[in-house]
Amino acid sequence: FNIVNDKIHLTISRFFGPSLGKVNIPDSLIIKLNNYIDEIIAKDTNEAQLNDYGPNLAGQVKQEIKLPKHIVEGELLDYLISISKLYVKLSTTQEITKFELMSTWIVRQFENEYNPAHVHGGHLSGAGYLKLPNSFGKTIQEKKKNIHGNINFIHGTEQFLSKGAISEKPCVGDFYIFPHYLFHSVNPFIG
């Protein structure tokens, strides 16, 4: 179902046990986060290396950059709190009384890199898209659906009236929110 709050349009889907929320990241946040990453990469300093969060994560990617406190505080934190509260209320009818952000990072995924199936700590997780390549590449089998670069959500096994997994083609601005225990992965892309 779809819920429109003052500023948030949240879609909740139940493809399997846990609910999956999807919202759009405000353009102002996309610009702020992209500018921050572009600046530290362009400076050619060791800031990107100092903030390298890759060793703590499941991904097989070269650049996973932890966001510093000054970038998270303010608009980004307020946004994450708002969507978390709305997601929990709509999924469970419960109210969040305490919110603690454990960590945030940006994954810069390039050709042939991927994130294997994994879960996170805490209670809720999220994944958003700030930039995407012009092309995810062609499939080897032309008649098959192109899932290059897709994000996958996996829960249980496929059975009557229940999918075991879904695969979503990302768009810039998509943000998914889900329980921390929901396995998710990101496919590699070509080109």
Task: Map each language-model feature to its residues.
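Short, intrinsically disordered, charge-balanced linker/junction segments flanking boundaries
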Residues: 190-191
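Short, charged beta-turn/beta-strand-edge "cap" motif at the junction between a beta-strand
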Residues: 182-185
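A general secondary-structure signal for short beta-strands and their flanking turns/coil
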Residues: 16-18, 99, 121-123
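Non-heme Fe(II)/2-oxoglutarate
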Residues: 1-94, 105, 112-115
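Catalytic core of non-heme Fe(II) oxygenases with the double-stranded beta-helix
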Residues: 102-177, 187
